[in-house]
């Protein structure tokens, strides 16, 4: 069968790589993709991701059997709806169901209604009310802008001054807009991907841990993710089971009960508190860079899992008996302003590197985004995989990239 992947980043690179391995898949297309994907897929950078009509026309022309949507924006914009209306099979939720990521308030309200464990929250609609609220709120407080923010719309404020600054950032010159304040939760964070079809929820039996902050020791601003690893040895199978029972199954049932037909992967960003696992966020797609490490460890056929889910079967994932560590190299300045067009070399176009922000300029690759390339390390345990990942990092040549030196350290410190 012919499969079309939508997206241009490292997550989509990993999806294309994994789908290309499937005996069920004859051809993988990627729109818009990036040139690093050309060994495994037919890449069409000339078609832009927001051009839904061009994507539809391409899918018709190439007799595409399945479309796999990687990023959140096309889901929120209703690409899945348009494709389904024209008879295509799509892995990714429709516009209505994608609100679970598109609106933090939508997600909080549905969790509140169905008693799904999450932090207490307060919504405000005006800047002046936000400034009033923080005068007496408990610190630290988590400040979230409603809507999509590429993983960067969350600020943890430890002081009133930091909270005021967060509000200024969220509102800018506007006086109105929805901001959600949340009680700060303490504990170990983890990411659980769950395949969902209506009220059928099939969680991965392997979790990953992301590293959101830009710099070592979890310092600096939030990013889209500076690295990840799996499995997470200090999060037990019992916690995974509890997360499934108290979060994954209830949210699938809640969404269907509210009239939202979710089909795709639901990302559960959770935290293990002293009171058990609680939801930090939901995403309507694979995490990035979690997808890269999880799909590298997945032994079973991703395409078969998607078909099983479509047929309402409780698919069984199989995993390699190894650990995976992924370290992200990003443009200096990210997640704030950064330069583009800097040469990057030293890496191979294979499963050891997944590219997020590079483009071809002549025969060389140059930076084109904030997060640039993820180096994948493999090993019998986390320590060996971490060593292998940083060896792969050291092979990359560029004067304009930075990376964290402590990806997966938590797993080693908590042994």
From Swiss-Prot:
Catalyses which reaction(s): 5-phospho-beta-D-ribosylamine + glycine + ATP = N(1)-(5-phospho-beta-D-ribosyl)glycinamide + ADP + phosphate + H(+)
Pfam families xref list: GARS_A, GARS_C, GARS_N
Binding site for Mg(2+): 281, 283
InterPro entries to which the protein is assigned, alphabetical: ATP-grasp, ATP_grasp_subdomain_1, PreATP-grasp_dom_sf, PRibGlycinamid_synth_ATP-grasp, PRibGlycinamide_synth, PRibGlycinamide_synth_C-dom, PRibGlycinamide_synth_C_sf, PRibGlycinamide_synth_CS
SMART domains: GARS_A (SM01209), GARS_C (SM01210)
The EC number(s) this enzyme carries: 6.3.4.13
Molecular function (Gene Ontology), one example: ATP binding
Cofactor(s) this protein cannot do without: Mg(2+); Mn(2+)
Cofactor remark: Binds 1 Mg(2+) or Mn(2+) ion per subunit.
Keywords annotated in UniProt: ATP-binding, Ligase, Magnesium, Manganese, Metal-binding, Nucleotide-binding, Purine biosynthesis
Functional pathway: Purine metabolism; IMP biosynthesis via de novo pathway; N(1)-(5-phospho-D-ribosyl)glycinamide from 5-phospho-alpha-D-ribose 1-diphosphate: step 2/2
Superkingdom of the source species: Bacteria
Ranges where the ATP-grasp domain occurs: 108-311
GO terms (BP aspect): 'de novo' IMP biosynthetic process; purine nucleobase biosynthetic process
UniProt enzyme class: ligase
Binding site for ATP: 134-191
PROSITE patterns: ATP_GRASP (PS50975), GARS (PS00184)
Similarity comment text for this entry: Belongs to the GARS family.
Protein name as annotated: Phosphoribosylamine--glycine ligase
Gene source species: Staphylococcus aureus (strain COL)
